[in-house]
């Protein structure tokens, strides 16, 4: 069996979503790669109160209703969106920064984060 060279860099290849005390949602390099977030400058947020899940839908245009600018760190190895109003509106308490393994829902075309 031939060997395959591993050339990826970054802290983790596993996609992670952080929900931070300051009202931001962050994405690590693994999430940006796996979900191709670097091709989407905006996201739209959704919330399912019954299942306590956040939906994060990447979009290409600012005109999409409810869109938020996705900010990228140096080299696009991290990304974040400021969304304190989202947490306040849905009364989602964020007392500590927490990391989650989001799942991409192909049907809905969005990342689902189960709180």
List the predicted regions and their residue ranges.
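Long, contiguous, secondary-structure-rich segments that constitute the structural scaffold
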Residues: 1-24, 29-115
């Amino acid at each position: 069996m031939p060997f395959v060279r591993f050339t990826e860099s970054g802290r983790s290849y596993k996609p992670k979503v952080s929900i931070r005390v300051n009202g931001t949602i962050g994405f690590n390099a693994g999430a940006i790669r796996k979900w191709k977030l670097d091709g989407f400058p905006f996201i739209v947020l959704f919330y399912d109160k019954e299942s306590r899940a956040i939906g994060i839908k990447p979009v290409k245009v600012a005109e999409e209703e409810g869109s938020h600018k996705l900010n990228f760190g140096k080299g696009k190895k991290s990304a974040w969106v400021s969304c304190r109003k989202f947490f306040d509106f849905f009364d989602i308490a964020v007392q500590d920064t927490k990391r989650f393994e989001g799942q991409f829902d192909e049907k809905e075309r969005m990342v689902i984060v189960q709180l």
